[in-house]
């Protein structure tokens, strides 16, 4: 066991912030320092090269003497767990030939002023560590216990008389009927159950997995109901089955898309190719991960995103996740530095994360998984809501909603799973088993706070998106084989772990199975059979493949370094047998064989560890499949509606318009969402056509997201969210209708062809066990399932429910309860024919125009449940939340609105579009003004007593910008669709930096543009100051609030349409370029495409191909090192990848020879840039290059920034000098750190960030990583090798850019970079 001391773990501003928080409790406490602490276990019988280990880890042996009065505390991963960092770093060190059994990293904190009071103070402990994921240890000796391995825990047999006790002890959440059912079945089997069988049954039959409430029969108010909830949802598909290819039958729904062509590497040769145009299809799925996010926000949200991504990948026989969405509903934030009068104090559940902690950590977790996996997150929502119903009852989201969804691409030949046959091999693909996420399915199905804290922790999972990336590469390879795809059927591993996934896989094909527990990959030899079978370790899939394909499948996994194990076989008898020592066919032992393909890769792809079987009892599981799936008791619910709500009605006549406007814009639900958006990559994959950010000033105000179906098409897919949950406290049916309506009004920003092509995912949340809430849920489902959606010809082919949305705890001598409203989140998806015809809230500056409001309420202007009411709630016993509830009164009105928008778009009458929602028309208008840096004169032509309902009602509707010259044509079109009574001119843009409300030429209220913007920006600013570098937060606010700021101002020194490569392409010669990737790289497809378009022949090269000698760099004229997260960036971005080259002599020599050849070129982008910068010692002319370290903001930055191309020797940038170009930025470590000032002066800088005035950007976020003089791209002395942190390969077409001048054509300027390389080769 070795302990090493690493570099400082916290930057100066984070240390100061940390110390300040400690001193609020113990003023005399000082932090001397905080360092990374590495704990290393060496493989038995091996000797470690300590100098190499010190070099790789940038660490040293601990030898200093303790300082007087200084106390050290160690914050380590929770005892008994393996951190994601450990998994990635262990693999990295194996790749560098280091004989490491395991490595963990923690933080050593040295404290001055530590006392007995501090040692026992809970507030200090809370600041030092998170008990859900970490342990606080007092000495190095305690740290070394982290690797202690306890004895394997035994299998248990449970007497039938003890089932109730086991139900509580194991957290099974079984009902009395289910316990009786189990007693009956085991009596018939003449034996007692094992603990494994009980846990498996509990997970498979949990509300989370079996959806018992949605499948229940109902009696409401003493009346039998004709439908179950699920039947009402399915009714929408029965009414409108068109355009749906798969519904309710798989991990995701599949719907029709436009014809497209796939671009991917040939699975045999690795050469990238455009495949034939085929009918399009895409899968859609939206999940929630509420309970884990309430307990541990970062890993809860991260694994929520990861689980949904796996659902898309495991659809049919293999899909490819393409773009994501996310969302959060929480209670009041109560930001200490941003108090609001409506956020009144109350008791909070001590066992759950606060709303602020959830929003500080949860979005980072969700974004981190998407970023590292390589999926753009293009859409989201955020709601903060809380309403006091009594002293002990609150309607809020203490148990949050964490939404994770998206869409993916799937080949039509792979939509349907094949049936497994007896003898087919059962595969576990992905990471090893660990004691994490145990019982999550059952835990998420009960009221939060009613289980034990230990069970809460056990249900929390941990994330490793880089492992999931490897799994996806295996799936992609199998799918590319077309009809030879070896995958017959598969499922992702989620709730219940293997205990749910493998039985589901078998049950789908009506077969049984024999599973050997000893074959299941595990990182923890102490796991009991229950823990091994039921844990929810993430990034795993279970697959069924035929035995003859096993060898080829093993070779695919080996190349991708993706662990897998053949754990069992399918059997004709529908019996599940699981245990140690079961007999399996010899052919399944492929993972133990040294085939020619594996032999060359053994050093880099070790066979996963499996448990050594001690003497165990007989089979842990031996059950007929129908015990799990056949005849469990069906639920019947007998309920009644609660009394009508008694919320008082807001008296808007007593409000001040000036202050009301500021309050509404400052409410977190309305306020700017930049803090949620810029942390997430939105350009990865190269198929983004509309992300959240719009316009030259880049504000996140888009109403929907759009992706492209292919790299050469304008057809694609659009998706949007609708959510109006607080209204359910007034009328749950109306709230559901409003959610569907809002999804449609958001989606109308895209060129939707037909309402019948729109498909919805419905995510339902409720506290179903609280009296009356289930009846309100029934009303809501009926309102859209039986009534609204069929009337609109819209179907709901997919969805999810989470029906334990309440939290209960003891405090102040009382029982406190927090219950969410009945909540519906609608995600709407549709194919679109031409993404260029999208609209955004960005107002046109050059045109005299007016803004028109199309209000679908018919003038009712109902204020019930509005943000206006919420921000005027005070300490009253019952806040004024009531009044008439907004509603979609007639579906025909929405149909007419949809038709109007389509016809107006087709006629070219619309310049801008924004839906009306939270905050009403006032908020929507302000957002359009903010996006466009324009002022507004808002007109109020009706009586002044109707002023507040007019401006702040949140009925369905939209605001459009219409040029004055098109006023008559638009009015005629409105009349044609019967909407004249619903439409009015509401504002016109001005160039003045102010927003006014006018009535009969009288100014009723006026604000400066900056005043309103400050209110709107306040939540983003406050959270960024708490979460990120506060200096950066202040700098961004100052730039964003400046009305005269120029924004993005591109200029071109060349014609992007001029193809300098064409003379060489016309020769028919296509030189080969190695599209180089390491495990965790995710930007290779779009890189290959750009080189292909420029006249090269792109070839997929994994580092394993070079290591094994399958290919050699001599075969290529160039190499492109792609972006992503090699080895998860665990030791610094790109360092693991570089280390795998530097620590292998043959590989190091091969790269050095390639770099030296003057007829070869190399391009490094993002992670590839970071990797090549670490190899500068072997790159001629690169000796002055910097290394790239953590961004100044200490946050992942996803931005569209403005770059200037500087005159340099770079062959890639020839003829582009002087151009100022928008470019996608997405990285966490882009700060260029030079060894000396002389190096900075001597380096050949090729690209730099600039501001809109053309000056080097020195302020955040115009310089998103803080590099000196905005430096972000460099080249060598001869220009053959260029590195840059931004992503030109993601925007070869103008449709890919978040914003660009209207006059730019099809080709974006960045395509010239790749064409220059082809011209240089000649």
Swiss-Prot record:
Subunit details: Monomer.
Source species of the chain: Xylella fastidiosa (strain Temecula1 / ATCC 700964)
NCBIfam families reported for this sequence: FGAM_synt, PRK05297.1
Known EC number: 6.3.5.3
Enzyme class: ligase
Gene3D superfamilies xref list: 3.40.50.880, Phosphoribosylformylglycinamidine synthase, linker domain, PurM-like C-terminal domain, PurM-like, N-terminal domain
Task performed by this protein: Phosphoribosylformylglycinamidine synthase involved in the purines biosynthetic pathway. Catalyzes the ATP-dependent conversion of formylglycinamide ribonucleotide (FGAR) and glutamine to yield formylglycinamidine ribonucleotide (FGAM) and glutamate.
Chain ranges of the Glutamine amidotransferase type-1 domain: 1073-1322
Annotated family: In the N-terminal section; belongs to the FGAMS family.
Lineage of the species this protein comes from: Bacteria, Pseudomonadati, Pseudomonadota, Gammaproteobacteria, Lysobacterales
Keyword Nucleus annotated: no
GO cellular component, one term: cytoplasm
Residues that bind ATP: 300-311, 702, 917
Family annotation (InterPro entries): Class_I_gatase-like, FGAR-AT_N, FGAR-AT_PurM_N-like, PurL_large, PurL_linker, PurM-like_C_dom, PurM-like_C_sf, PurM-like_N_sf
Name the record gives this protein: Phosphoribosylformylglycinamidine synthase
Any one Gene Ontology molecular-function term assigned to this protein's record: ATP binding
Active site location: 1166, 1287, 1289
Main localization of the protein described in the UniProt heading: cytoplasm
